[in-house]
Regions:
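Polar, enzyme-active/binding microenvironments
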Residues: 1-90
């Protein structure tokens, strides 16, 4: 996904159970970290919320999308496979 620099996009992601790598994980408390333009990973500012059926969302801040280049997201939680995604900030 392409993200415009300085915007506040909402990122939606699915977490699955690490026990079978396919069952949607509900009731988790995910930690989301980002790497901006090749920098070190750091926690996102806003809280992550569960939508339903293993889907979660987090809204990035304008500061978090302020650097052009690769924006890597990593979501982890107890008993789930890590979720990773790469976006391009332009």
């Amino acid at each position: 996904m392409q993200i415009t620099s300085g915007t506040t996009p909402t990122i939606v992601f699915l977490l699955v159970s690490s026990s079978d790598d396919k069952t949607a994980l509900t009731g988790a408390t995910p930690t989301v970290t980002i790497s901006k333009a090749g920098g070190s990973f750091a926690a996102v500012t806003n809280a992550v919320s569960e939508i339903s059926s293993g889907f979660y969302k987090v809204t990035l801040t304008a500061l978090e999308t302020g650097s052009t280049g690769a924006l890597i997201l990593l979501a982890t939680a107890t008993s789930c496979d890590p979720w990773r995604d790469i976006h391009q900030v332009v």
